[in-house]
Amino acid sequence: VLLLAGLIIVNLIVNHLPVKVTQFDFSNAKLYTLTDTTTGILKNLDQDVELYYICEGGKEDDTIQKLLDRYESASSHIKVEQIDPALYPGFTSKYTQEDVANNSVIAVSGDVSKVVNADSMYVESMNYNTYSYVKTGFDGEGMITSAVDYVTAKDICIS
């Protein structure tokens, strides 16, 4: 009984540790490790940023979800919230009039927002054998960091 109680307590403690301590990035491309540039931008944040992950329940993109977890654990100014468009169909219209694809991210700080569509996070190339596009790379970090930088910029030029 004491062993079981001890395991439960250890499990509760581990569940409250930040992602960077409990998960390791063994991918060759370091998909889940934030670059020094992103870490620097997040470290210098002086205002809160909401990252809304627009995704239907059960259709999450594991790569994007883990990346967002890294952002949230890297800065106390970043909060990630998953929004199911089936449950909240009008949510994205607060930030854009365009259609927002599943697995997209909306960065919001104050009155400023920026949509990062899921399609723009992946690099695609034409496979001439099958005449179809295939995913060949991932730049989710670059796109999300750019959005965070945009919504927290002191001077925004809107044309």
Enumerate the language-model features and the residues they cover:
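Short, surface-exposed patches at the edges or C-terminal ends of soluble domains, predominantly
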Residues: V1-S159
